[in-house]
Amino acid sequence: MQVSVEATQGLERRLTISVPAEQIEKLVKDSLQREAKRARIPGFRPGKVPVTVINKRYGAAIRQDITGEVMQRNFIEAIIAEKLNPAGAPTFIPGSTDSEKFEFVATFEIYPEVELKGLDAIEVEQPKASVTDADVDSMIETLRKQHATYAAVEREAADGDKVKMNFVGSVDGEEFEGGKAEDFELQLGSGRMIPGFEAGILGHKAGEEFVIDVNFPEEYHAENLKGKAAKFAITLTEVQAANLPEVNDEFAALFGINEGGLEALKTEIRKNMNRELEQALKANVKEQVIAGLLANNDIELPKALIDGEVNVLRQQAMQRFGGQTANMPELPAELFTEQAARRVKIGLLLGEVIKTNELKAEDERVQGLIASMASAYEDPSEVIAYYNSNKELMQNMRNVALEEQAVEALLKSAKVTEKEVAFEEFMNKATGRA
């Protein structure tokens, strides 16, 4: 086998490989003979079909298969010999064939050489938060509201009430599409409607008819309504006030707490809040570390890896539509290219961190991650056993553990400052509610 390597552009490489023609001819001959022994062709006894007949019928297909196998095998031998690391499947182009040699070209991309830079310039503001008694009480109040019952009242509508209404919206005296509704239910303070709409209902009683003036936001989804002043003629048909359940052992039973009553519920709530806080704190620090790593390291990305990641993201997006994808056109790659490139870059950089620091997934950490995830389920031991018996899930957890270890390695050289934050403030920002 003879090999020449050419760097074409960027990460692309072109291998020109020559193999002795007799190697292919021998493989073709052997394959034809094997086929002759097992072929069943009318007019010939089993195992007695002449090779010339087999060659006439199947020769072209057999030669094509053998050629493909030869190219694949010699390509692998060539990249090992040349110490090349392909970042995707090669494209084979069969070339000239004469009595002495068969030549073909393999084109592919290689992984970039990654040299980590600016690790000591990464800046991280590490939040410090804890779950207080007041935070637990606030969560219980939220749970009370979620389990509230509503009853009609003969008073003015207030924040937190549910109301029923009929309304007709107009712009410049003309009704607009989607601006009319009957028996419309709305919880005041939910923020579901455009600014000013809910506030305009406060202080009104059931049976009242009134008009409120509002302005559609400039970023409103309907082009014809962006930034427009509008009037809504409203007939308020019902005002309902919330009746919150008392906080006692019966309240605890609503959440499956059958022993220990209210104190057991508070313990469970605190445990869940601590778990969510720990996950959010880790995610916040990781996000900052990754952002710094990306900002300080510019590397060339193999298109093959980006294309592969685009396909993964596209598939995930299609799955979110459930069974409604049969008649949908394929989502364009451009929708996912930027996110895919970012994910590929993160993977390559973290891979280099893992390699440089000789990191291996710590078993104790892996089991800790599984236990933390399983604690959210009714029977954690069953979930833990399921993960430990599933190779794919365990590999996913090892990858998560390795990422954590890589982030921790980067933190050692980063500029880290600690900042005390309140639980509610931090979690609102983490979940996008701030």
Curated annotation (Swiss-Prot):
Reported function: Involved in protein export. Acts as a chaperone by maintaining the newly synthesized protein in an open conformation. Functions as a peptidyl-prolyl cis-trans isomerase.
Domain note: Consists of 3 domains; the N-terminus binds the ribosome, the middle domain has PPIase activity, while the C-terminus has intrinsic chaperone activity on its own.
A GO CC term assigned to this protein in UniProt: cytoplasm
Reaction(s) the record says it catalyses: [protein]-peptidylproline (omega=180) = [protein]-peptidylproline (omega=0)
Protein name, as recorded: Trigger factor
HAMAP family: Trigger_factor_Tig (MF_00303)
Domain of life, per lineage: Bacteria
Similarity comment: family membership: Belongs to the FKBP-type PPIase family. Tig subfamily.
Leading EC class: isomerase
Residues covered by the PPIase FKBP-type domain: 160-245
Database matches in Pfam families: FKBP_C, Trigger_C, Trigger_N
EC number(s) reported in the record: 5.2.1.8
InterPro entries (alphabetical): PPIase_dom_sf (IPR046357), PPIase_FKBP_dom (IPR001179), Trig_fac (IPR005215), Trigger_fac_C (IPR008880), Trigger_fac_C_sf (IPR037041), Trigger_fac_ribosome-bd_bac (IPR008881), Trigger_fac_ribosome-bd_sf (IPR036611), Trigger_fact/SurA_dom_sf (IPR027304)
Keyword Cell cycle belongs to the record: yes
NCBIfam families: tig
Gene3D superfamilies, A to Z: 3.10.50.40, Trigger factor ribosome-binding domain, Trigger factor, C-terminal domain
One annotated GO biological process: protein unfolding
Subcellular location: Cytoplasm
SUPFAM superfamilies the record matches: FKBP-like, Triger factor/SurA peptide-binding domain-like, Trigger factor ribosome-binding domain
One MF term in the entry's GO annotations: protein folding chaperone
Statement: the UniProt record of this protein carries the keyword Chaperone: yes
Keyword terms, alphabetized: Cell cycle, Cell division, Chaperone, Cytoplasm, Isomerase, Rotamase
Source organism of the structure: Shewanella putrefaciens (strain CN-32 / ATCC BAA-453)
Principal location class: cytoplasm
